[in-house]
């Protein structure tokens, strides 16, 4: 669903920010 896609995108963005 759209909500799940949004959560996945936010999780990936957060992980990306932490790893940088």
UniProtKB/Swiss-Prot annotation:
One GO biological process term is: monoatomic ion transport
| Disulfide topology | none
* UniProt entry keywords in alphabetical sequence: Cytolysis, Ion transport, Membrane, Nematocyst, Secreted, Target cell membrane, Target membrane, Toxin, Transmembrane, Transport
Molecular function via GO: toxin activity
Chief place where the protein resides:
secreted
Task: Report which superkingdom the organism of origin falls in.
Answer: Eukaryota
Q: Which GO terms describe its cellular component?
A: extracellular region; membrane; nematocyst; other organism cell membrane
Q: Where is this region: N-terminal region?
A: 11-20
Region (Plays an important role in the hemolytic activity) spans which residues?
Answer: 3-12
Localisation: Secreted; Nematocyst; Target cell membrane
Q: Does the keyword Endoplasmic reticulum apply?
A: no
What role is this protein assigned?
Pore-forming protein that forms cations-selective hydrophilic pores of around 1 nm and causes cardiac stimulation and cytolysis. Pore formation is a multi-step process that involves specific recognition of membrane sphingomyelin (but neither cholesterol nor phosphatidylcholine) using aromatic rich region and adjacent phosphocholine (POC) binding site, firm binding to the membrane (mainly driven by hydrophobic interactions) accompanied by the transfer of the N-terminal region to the lipid-water interface and finally pore formation after oligomerization of monomers.
Q: How does it assemble?
A: Octamer or nonamer in membranes. Monomer in the soluble state.
Of which family is this protein a member?
Belongs to the actinoporin family. Sea anemone subfamily.
What does UniProt say about this protein's domains? Answer: Composed of a long N-terminal alpha-helix and a core region rich in beta-sheet structures. Before the pore formation, the alpha-helix binds the lipid membrane, partitions into the lipid-water interface and stabilizes the monomeric molecule on the membrane. Finally, it traverses the bilayer, thus forming the transmembrane pore.
Protein name (record)? Equinatoxin-1''
Give the originating organism. Actinia equina
């Amino acid at each position: 669903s759209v909500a799940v896609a949004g959560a996945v995108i936010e999780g990936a963005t957060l992980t990306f920010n932490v790893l940088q």
